[in-house]
C-alpha cells in the first residue's frame, strides 16, 4: 500500500501490530498541565480490518482515522484474524532467575501464555520453541483454538469483539 509508506509516525510490527505514537506538540511528555494535551491522533491504517487495542473499536483499513490518544496512551492496533501471543502483563523483567521475590521474572511468567484474537478469521502461529497455536472464529460462532507441543504451559485464548 503506497500510502502506508508515507507514514513517518507509524510502525508495523510484523504483519500483526501497528504502533502509532503521538509525535507532535501538545503530547503529554514532560507536561504538568494536561488541559492542553492532545486527546486524539490522526492515523492511517493499512488495508484490512484493524482493532484499537485499548478500546476494542473496529476500524476499516485503507483510510485515515482520528483515534483516541489520551495522555499516557499509545495508539496501538491489531490486525483482524491474526494471533497475538502475550505473556502475563505483570512481568517486571525478561531476565530469568531473579532472586528478589518482589520482582516477577521471565521464568515465572513462562508457565502461561494468553492469546489475543481480534475479530474473525483463521490463523496458525508458531512460537520460538515450536509450540503451534491455531485459532478459528467465524461470524455467528464461538471461537476455537488448539495448541500443539505446548511445553507444559497453560494457554488461554481471548476472542476480542
Name these PLM-found stretches.
Residues 1-154, 159:
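Catalytic core of carbohydrate-active enzymes
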Amino acid at each position: 500500500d503506497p500510502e502506508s509508506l508515507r507514514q513517518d509516525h507509524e510502525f508495523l510490527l510484523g504483519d500483526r501490530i501497528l504502533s502509532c505514537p503521538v509525535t507532535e506538540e501538545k503530547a503529554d511528555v514532560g507536561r504538568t498541565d494536561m488541559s492542553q494535551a492532545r486527546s486524539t491522533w490522526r492515523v492511517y491504517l493499512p488495508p484490512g480490518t484493524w482493532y484499537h487495542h485499548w478500546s476494542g473499536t473496529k476500524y476499516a483499513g485503507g483510510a485515515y482515522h482520528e483515534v483516541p490518544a489520551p495522555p499516557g496512551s499509545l495508539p496501538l492496533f491489531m490486525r483482524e484474524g491474526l494471533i497475538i501471543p502475550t505473556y502475563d502483563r505483570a512481568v517486571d523483567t525478561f531476565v530469568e532467575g531473579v532472586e528478589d521475590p518482589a520482582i516477577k521474572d521471565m521464568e515465572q511468567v513462562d508457565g502461561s501464555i494468553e492469546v489475543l484474537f481480534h475479530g474473525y478469521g483463521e490463523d496458525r502461529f508458531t512460537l520460538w520453541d515450536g509450540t503451534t497455536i491455531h485459532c478459528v472464529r467465524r461470524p455467528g460462532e464461538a471461537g476455537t483454538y488448539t495448541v500443539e507441543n505446548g511445553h507444559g504451559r497453560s494457554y488461554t485464548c481471548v476472542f476480542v469483539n
